[in-house]
């Protein structure tokens, strides 16, 4: 406040009555500070006097303060977030969440409640249980995609809003599928009686129009009914093992080509009764009676297509005790506290062309496969290894030029026959208290380590320890590369091509069209095209190409290749050499068709391609077509 006088005087201010709806600070100089009471709006006032000291003249005045209304935010919080994390999934299509909320400016009836899952609005119903409390029920039945998503429970007063959030697994597209279960495998799966079994089939990751094209089916096997005795139900054990496995893959060194590349579909019995839909059991093989039976006549693999016909990979998680196994695209593992280790291992076989790196006493000859995996070899020269591009120094190769050993905090060594004096590099790092702090990066490198499943001696693996030996949730650089190649293949680069000749108005063939049905991120992958081994950069990242007929009607070789920009796949790939990329593991032969007799007479990698009509190669990171234009 301020007063003026018509002559020089000293003005002294005094508060005569203070405010009633706030705190007023008033000084003798007339400066004021006012803080309204919480949630007050309206008018408040105070009175003061001002005195001209030399004249002893006093005047009084009253000041009115107007406090404008400000909308206060509503507040909401979930009463519990128990089990709302990445170790659990929401199976119920209509889950309910208890909330506590408040809003100074509005009654409960003035508030609205909503929910968002993965940025997608979902229908909600709010039920009040008492003042400031209630239940918010969600309708997740129409959720378009599944996955590990963030969810928000929201309250609004029409102007402002507040939310509480959590992150957990949401499923989608849940349906009930009825499958005929064989009653007696001894009479064959194509004869005898069957019993219909109902299974819930749902997406755990993906669904709808998603980027990933590797459809991975998980099947719950031999689950018993809940005994309701306080023990963990089998269905809970299955889901826990399932989520641990998916989380492990998402956290692994293969995550770059797992997360987003895989759609996960789950099948579990509606009424668990302890039976096995695919007739899973052990005892089929004399070399190990504990391994699960998996041959074509040993399990009823047709039920997997009945559950989900578009599966690319199948993992059966079973309550039956046994040793994990993989054959082709199907693997079986026991539901147990470390299921994720077995699953990552078996998935390496199914998806990434990985072999076993552990030593075995299985009584069978497996030497045929010693060189037919991305990660096993009988080659002893590092310069000739199929994984040499991952070796930092070919003159100082881990495993060959220096010995790596697994060490404990007390200084002892795990490796048989070794001690600290014979080891050049100790694998584990420990602090002064004996706590392991990590892996020694000098030891955990790609090299040439002797011993794997195909032989203890004269057989080699690329790293000291990976999941393909077991016990560590890491694939290693070579195996992660194999995993990435499998994912890239499934995006359509391997078998997604459609070809046709292009003709002019007279019917003469003027070109050859290759149309590739692929899905990829150009920030991570680059599609390149070649003619007779020479890249045509003008065609980069085009998925439909027409190659013009050459004027001399010669043999022309048309190739497409994927270049991995993430740095995961770095194997050298000369498109004119069928065997340089992991020794041809990921591609077919160059098949050529001679139709001069009226039907195809096939040749394999012929040196003279002019004697054939056309040829093709599948892989390794794309494909190739050869056209002998003189025959077209």
Name each model-derived stretch.
Residues 1-35, 63-68, 102-137, 164-167:
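Surface-exposed or secretory-pathway low-complexity segments enriched in glycine-proline
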Residues 42-52, 147-157:
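A short beta-strand micro-motif common to beta-rich folds, especially ectodomain repeats
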Residues 324-344:
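Short pre-active-site segment immediately N-terminal to the catalytic Zn-binding motif
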Residues 22, 71-76, 493-494:
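Proline-centered linker/hinge motifs at extracellular inter-domain junctions
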Residues 55-70, 162-175, 573-581, 586-591, ...:
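C-terminal edge beta-strand
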Residues 1-7, 52, 99-106, 117, ...:
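Extracellular acidic, Ser/Thr/Pro-rich low-complexity tracts
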Residues 171-310, 322, 334, 601:
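Propeptide-to-catalytic entry region of secreted or membrane-anchored zinc metalloproteases
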């Amino acid at each position: 406040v301020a007063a003026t006088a018509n002559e020089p005087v000293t003005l002294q201010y005094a508060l005569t009555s203070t405010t009633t709806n706030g705190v007023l600070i008033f000084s003798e100089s007339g400066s004021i500070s006012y803080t309204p009471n919480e949630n007050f709006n309206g008018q408040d006032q105070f009175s003061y006097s001002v005195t001209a000291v030399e004249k002893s003249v006093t005047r009084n005045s009253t000041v009115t303060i107007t406090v404008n209304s400000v909308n206060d935010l509503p507040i909401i919080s979930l009463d519990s977030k128990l089990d709302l994390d990445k170790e659990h999934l929401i199976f119920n299509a209509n889950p309910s969440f208890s909330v506590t909320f408040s809003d100074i400016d509005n009654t409960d009836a003035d508030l609205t409640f909503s929910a968002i899952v993965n940025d997608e609005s979902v229908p909600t119903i709010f039920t009040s249980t008492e003042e400031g409390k209630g239940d918010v029920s969600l309708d997740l039945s129409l959720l378009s995609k599944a996955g590990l998503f963030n969810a928000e429970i929201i309250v609004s007063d029409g102007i402002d809003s507040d939310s509480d959030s959590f992150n957990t697994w949401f499923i989608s597209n849940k349906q009930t599928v009825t499958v005929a279960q064989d009653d007696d495998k001894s009479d064959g799966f194509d004869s005898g009686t069957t019993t219909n079994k109902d299974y819930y089939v749902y997406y755990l990751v993906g669904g709808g129009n998603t980027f990933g094209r590797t459809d991975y089916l998980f099947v719950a096997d031999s689950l018993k009914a809940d005994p309701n005795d306080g023990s963990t139900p089998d269905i809970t054990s299955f889901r826990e093992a399932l989520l641990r496995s998916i989380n492990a893959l998402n956290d692994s060194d293969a995550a770059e080509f797992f997360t987003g590349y895989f759609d996960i579909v789950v099948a579990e019995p509606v009424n668990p009764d302890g039976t096995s839909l695919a007739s899973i059991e052990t005892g089929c093989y004399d070399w190990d009676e504990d391994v699960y039976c998996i041959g074509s006549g040993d399990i009823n693999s047709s039920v997997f297509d009945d559950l989900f016909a578009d599966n690319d990979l199948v993992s059966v998680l079973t309550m039956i005790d046994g040793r994990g196994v993989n054959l082709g695209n199907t693997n079986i593992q026991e539901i147990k506290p470390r299921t994720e280790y077995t699953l990552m291992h078996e998935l390496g076989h199914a998806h990434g062309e990985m072999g076993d790196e552990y030593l075995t006493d299985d009584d069978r000859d497996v030497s045929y496969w010693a060189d037919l995996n991305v990660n096993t070899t009988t080659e002893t020269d590092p310069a000739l290894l199929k994984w040499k591009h991952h070796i930092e120094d070919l003159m100082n190769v881990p495993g060959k030029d220096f010995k790596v050993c697994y060490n404990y905090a007390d200084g002892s060594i795990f490796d048989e026959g070794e001690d600290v004096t014979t080891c050049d590099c100790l694998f584990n790092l420990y602090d002064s208290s004996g706590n392991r702090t990590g892996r020694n990066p000098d030891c955990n490198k790609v090299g040439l380590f002797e011993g794997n499943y195909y032989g203890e001696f004269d057989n080699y693996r690329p790293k000291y320890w990976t999941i393909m030996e077991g016990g560590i949730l890491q694939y290693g650089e070579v195996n992660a590369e194999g995993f990435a190649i499998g994912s890239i293949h499934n995006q359509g680069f391997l078998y997604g091509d459609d070809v046709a000749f292009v003709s002019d108005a007279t019917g003469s063939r003027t070109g050859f069209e290759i149309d590739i049905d692929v899905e990829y991120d150009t920030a991570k992958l680059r599609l390149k095209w070649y003619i007779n081994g020479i890249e045509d950069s003008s065609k980069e990242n085009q998925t439909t190409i027409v190659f013009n007929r050459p004027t001399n009607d010669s043999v022309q070789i048309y190739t497409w290749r994927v270049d991995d920009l993430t740095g995961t796949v770095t194997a050298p790939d000369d498109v004119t050499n069928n065997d340089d990329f992991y020794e041809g593991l990921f591609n077919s032969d160059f098949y050529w068709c001679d139709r001069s007799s009226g039907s195809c007479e096939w040749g394999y990698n012929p040196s003279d391609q002019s004697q054939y009509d056309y040829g093709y190669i599948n892989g390794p990171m794309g494909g190739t077509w050869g056209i002998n234009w003189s025959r077209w």
